[in-house]
Amino acid sequence: MQRYPLAVEQAFPPEPVFLLTAAMQDVVREGTGQALKSYLPPEITVAGKTGTTDEQRDAWFAGFSGDRLAVVWVGYDDNRAARLSGSAAALPIWGDLMAALTPEPLALARPERIEMVSIDPQSGLRGGSSCPGARELPFMQGSAPSDRAPCSGPMDAAVDAVNQAVGETTKRAKTFLERLFGR
């Protein structure tokens, strides 16, 4: 590959790529891919997705780190059911492979138009420190739920207002500095 020059061209806007990658990191952190914790050290962050086709004919895991990408498929080439799931069959193979390759951690820079919003997992509405289990999740600016979860209190709304004001001030300062010094 090193003999053939690669021309890297961005094909998609950074915001949807960030959102999809964040969701795939959650699969590994707390979903069907969480068994990877036993293969990789905690500082190696990865993103991935398990898969199992109808009637368990195929099992797969596709994932990537900061510098590696691999897809593992487990199944029969005559279309017989393997009777295995992606997390049980393909994920361990992927985990062994990545552990042997010692990948770089996946580190994503959050695009400017992505905001982190506290969400109550029970209702899917805006949460806050008053909501047990509330998580910061990424959203395109302006697309986060505006309704508040029943568990969120008046202090959570005040914190949101302060964070929004600080964000607007930071944007204005950045715009001013860009005009002053150029990009």
Predicted regions and their residues:
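A penicillin-recognizing enzyme superfamily signal
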Residues: M1-P138
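Low-complexity, Gly/Ser/Thr/Pro-rich intrinsically disordered linker/tail segments
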Residues: V117-G182
